[in-house]
Amino acid sequence: GSIQVKWLRRILVTDLPAMAKDETSEYTDVTADGRVLAFTWVMEPQSIITYPSGGQRVQPGFHEIRGLAWSGFGRIAKVEVSFDEGRTWRKAVLEPPVEPYAFVRFKLQWYWDGKEVVLWSRAWDEKGNTQPTREEFFRRWSRNNRYHYNAIQAWRILPDGRVVNGDRPLGQGAFGPVGPVGGCGGEVLDV
């Protein structure tokens, strides 16, 4: 299996999906209405700003926003960055090579005036698929769908320059309130 390769003792090649515990639970997605999609292998478009990002500190002035984008559907076509929680977008520069199914670096020049701001990035692939907001993601998928979670990760820069998770809590769901959980926010768990 792909989950515990360190315990590999033998390899069995088959032309059918493995029906092992980890493959059936981790590669199964639950939709918002409770339907189950088994064996969803492809990761939809995703991007993440790596600078500035959580735990870092920045000073007012000019900065180069940097990050990574990828898609399981092929080549990244563009990445956009928002400084106002998605009301407006600026196109980032993709650094070559831009290959199908591969990480692509992006960058965008930006001046920070020292006021609180929330940064978002979103990726688009060559098939027209785009990265959803958290709200869009959870209208489609269950709140515990963390293995294929690809919603926009927000970074909030506070006036003192600290960069923290900028995701807003989502409110009540089937398992109570869901908010940002440690790390980069990529793990979405009911807390």
PLM region spans:
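Extended, aromatic/histidine-rich regions of cofactor-dependent oxidoreductases associated
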Residues: 1-191
